[in-house]
């Protein structure tokens, strides 16, 4: 009995090793789970469900195959794939969730989020995030030609990379006050999120009670998976195929 959490895979055509690692994970490891939660940034960017990119079809098929094996799949949008829509979700067998959302994890209320909404010190990013949440702007963008959408996405991606180089690590991380406030708002003591690419389990005290924040890692150099079972949360590392064709993985108990 286990539930799996992943995020920040950032799939793109330039990194077939990451695609192979995810597909292998979906085929070999995930079928034994009760459920799989993908907490955003599954793709490096997403310009619409109508994008004919073969990578998208392959990933949708891999998730659909997992769903057919009885594993429930849930998805929270990230800042890279916030335009991923119901068409792709339906084909993949995914259920789309709001950000944040509360789930029942083996009898415990657990708060899930991609995590970017907690980086409150990054004022420029939070302003951009509010703009990208505008429904009318999304509607307009999705009606542009695919080539135009791709050009805009590539430009924004490049600008983001340049800006992040100049930002301090503190600004790009979540703020403790935002974490505390969100947990209080939803009546939870456990938060699971991604976005920052800093996998760790943080134990702290919230209003006199033990609390925990679990951060998922990215899949740039190795896969990061959170395995939860009744009474236990464990972060695991999965080796990418190009580094270890045998498909071994290492576990870190934190």
UniProtKB/Swiss-Prot annotation:
The gene is lpxH. Its main location: membrane. Mn(2+) 2 binds at residues 41, 79, 114, 195. InterPro entries: Calcineurin-like_PHP_ApaH, LpxH-like, Metallo-depent_PP-like, UDP-diacylglucosamine_Hdrlase. The keyword Manganese applies. Its cofactor is Mn(2+). Gene3D superfamilies: 3.60.21.10. This is UDP-2,3-diacylglucosamine hydrolase. Mn(2+) 1 binds at residues 8, 10, 41, 197. Coiled coil: none annotated. Its EC number is 3.6.1.54. It comes from the Bacteria. It comes from Aeromonas salmonicida (strain A449).
